[in-house]
Amino acid sequence: MASHFFSAFSCLYSYFVLDVTNQAGINKGITTWEQVNLINEHIRTYLENKGMKILDIYVCPHRIEESCQCRKPQPGLLLKASKEHDINLAESIIVGDQDMDIEAGKNAGLKKVIKI
């Protein structure tokens, strides 16, 4: 899978890449912020070693029943990233493997969505 990922997304290497992730395990008590941050830093390092730079990582720790605005498919984290990094979402692309990823992009005003 990893080799297909890198060949498929090599065209994104010149773009700003943000990682927006739901991690309800934090609020469920299954994992900790420290563990999630360690995993995210491992992913960041791995991807950077492959030539893909991750500009920032955004994590929602909430469970579905908490009804927050940051858990995908809500657009909260995408809007926050847009504001913090001065990103025009209408000119951005969201790539995700879940319907909620694509819905979050659409809810944030992205016109280009790719489901893998």
Question: Could you describe each region identified by the protein language model?
Answer:
Residues 94-116:
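Acidic, Mg2+-coordinating phosphoryl-transfer loop and its flanking beta/alpha structural elements
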Residues 47-53, 86:
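Short helix-capping segments at alpha-helix termini
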Residues 69-99:
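Conserved Lys-Pro-Asp/Glu-containing loop-to-beta segment of HAD-superfamily phosphomonoesterases
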Residues 9-40, 52-66, 105:
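Substrate-recognition element of Asp-dependent hydrolases with the DxDx(T/V) motif
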Residues 1-8:
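Basic, amphipathic juxtamembrane/active-site segments
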Residues 43-48, 82:
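Conserved hydrophobic residues forming the short capping helix/wall of the S-adenosyl-L-methionine
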